[in-house]
Design a protein with these regions (language model features):
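Membrane-embedded alpha-helical bundles that constitute the cytochrome b-like, heme-associated redox core
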Residues: 1-222, 226-252, 267, 272, ...
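Pore-lining and gate-forming transmembrane alpha-helices of multi-pass membrane transport proteins
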Residues: 181-186, 252-264, 284, 288-289
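Aromatic- and Gly/Pro-enriched helix-to-coil junctions and flexible linker segments
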Residues: 74, 81, 94, 101, ...
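Interfacial loop-to-transmembrane junctions
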Residues: 269-291
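Small-residue-rich segments of transmembrane alpha-helices in multi-pass membrane proteins
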Residues: 155-163, 284-295
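Generic structural hydrophobic/aromatic packing signal, biased to beta-strands
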Residues: 31, 62, 136, 167, ...
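Composition- and surface-driven signal marking solvent-exposed, interaction-prone regions
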Residues: 29-30, 250-254, 277-285
């Protein structure tokens, strides 16, 4: 069992690596085509149906790009489709969600201080919210709201705020922000998979058959692509947020997430305008800085259970498994002596305001809850505690290893 813990952690690391790589490819391609589209310049010498061109230089070579409003008069034999960057990002993200927040849900997904849920119930809420969210958004885009893009965007923002609040009522702070990111990314990838790509195939098929494509497909793609454009930066923030307790360790984390979506709008508006006109509106940076100042202030408002509340809380079945294992008392004392100066509700380490990654190791319930992470980081490896903070000897690490293995025999 203990070997499986190490293997499982490496699987999670590998999938996370894949997710970051594919996300870089997707976001890079998305930003490139948005910038390219906005920088296109008209030219009377262009072929019929072409709306603009752009010359670029990169890596010692020159590139000449021509955009057609619908399509060229004759389709080329080879056509590159930009879709798998999006698909693999979502698929790897979904796999990572399952590995960390479903399989490891007793620790990372559920917060017993908020609601009393079985793990399977949390997983159903996790998966169901992503599915229902897409269906609701898709229905809105297919309604008359599509004729008023600004109103549609505002309603999308309202949905994101509601989901942010809802996730924070059920899940841990880390899981709440991660799920909001997954919710948003699901909308973005589903836009590509269910709308943009199928409609593009219809256009290509019409052209090959000699038919004039319906302009409505371009309109649909523009609405969905615009949403994806403004949602990209907040999704990246939400991907990174689980590494920074200041973003999720407060009762106002759902408001922080909402404000991050607004910063995504202001930043993208600047670059969209700059690519189109050559000069971006500088006021957007002032608004962005103001929003980040508000976010920083909100992050200082502490929340969560107190030390007394944590002591009084009844252990979950998962925690009881480790708290009742042989060697727990020695392991608990070892963790308290080596880790709790930082991993406390009020850390005593100089200039530390929050426990690293939000991991609290003060009570017996805390230590039992994070048993697997303690085993991996302070038992079989020397990742924790930092050597410049405290020197943890091999005997202390052996105590942790023996306790964890005893609980899993």
């Amino acid at each position: 069992m203990y070997d499986l813990a190490i293997l499982w952690d490496w699987i999670a690391f590998s999938v996370r690596w894949l997710h970051v790589i594919t996300a870089m490819a997707w976001i890079g391609a998305s930003f490139y085509f948005i910038a390219l589209d906005l920088m296109l310049k008209p030219n009377d010498a262009l072929p019929k149906g072409a709306s603009g061109e752009e010359w670029e230089v990169h890596g010692g070579g020159f590139y000449h790009t021509v955009k057609y409003l619908v399509a060229p008069s004759e389709m080329p034999e080879h056509l590159t489709w930009h879709k798998w960057q999006s698909y693999t990002t979502w698929l790897s993200g979904a796999a990572l969600l399952m590995i960390i927040y479903w399989v490891g849900g007793e620790l990372f997904l559920l917060d017993p201080t908020k609601v009393d849920l079985a793990l399977w119930q949390g997983i159903v809420i996790s998966a169901g919210s992503l599915t229902i969210g897409w269906l609701l958004y898709d229905a809105m885009c297919k309604s008359r709201l599509a004729d008023t893009p600004t109103l549609l965007m505002l309603l999308l923002f309202a949905i994101l705020v509601i989901m942010s609040w809802g996730y924070n009522q059920i899940f841990t702070g880390r899981a709440a922000l991660l799920h909001l990111g997954a919710f948003t990314a699901t909308i973005m990838t589903a836009n590509v998979f269910f709308q943009i790509m199928p409609n593009q195939r219809i256009v290509v098929a019409d052209l090959k058959a000699g038919r004039t494509p319906d302009a409505k497909y371009g309109k649909i793609a523009k609405v969905r692509s615009t949403h994806n454009n403004y949602l990209t930066l907040p999704v990246v923030f939400l991907m990174l947020a689980n590494h920074y307790p200041l973003s999720f360790g407060t009762q106002y984390s759902w408001i922080i997430a909402a404000l991050i979506f607004l910063t995504g709008v202001t930043i993208r508006h600047y670059f969209n305008t700059m690519h189109k006109t050559g000069k971006g509106p500088h006021w957007t940076w002032g608004v962005t800085v103001l929003l980040m100042i508000i976010i920083a202030w909100l992050s200082t408002q502490r929340s969560g259970d107190t030390y007394e509340d944590a002591l009084a809380r009844e252990l979950t079945a998962y925690e009881e498994r480790y708290a009742s294992a042989a060697g727990f008392e020695d392991a608990y004392n070892t963790v308290i002596g080596n880790c709790s100066m930082c991993h406390a509700r009020e850390p005593v380490w100089n200039n530390m305001q929050w426990a690293p990654k939000g991991v609290l190791l003060e009570t017996e319930g805390d230590v039992a809850r994070y048993a697997r992470q303690i085993y991996l980081h302070a038992g079989v490896s020397r990742a924790m505690p930092p050597p410049n903070a405290i020197q943890m000897d091999s005997e202390a690490r052996a105590i942790i290893i023996a306790w964890y293995r005893a609980a899993n025999d």
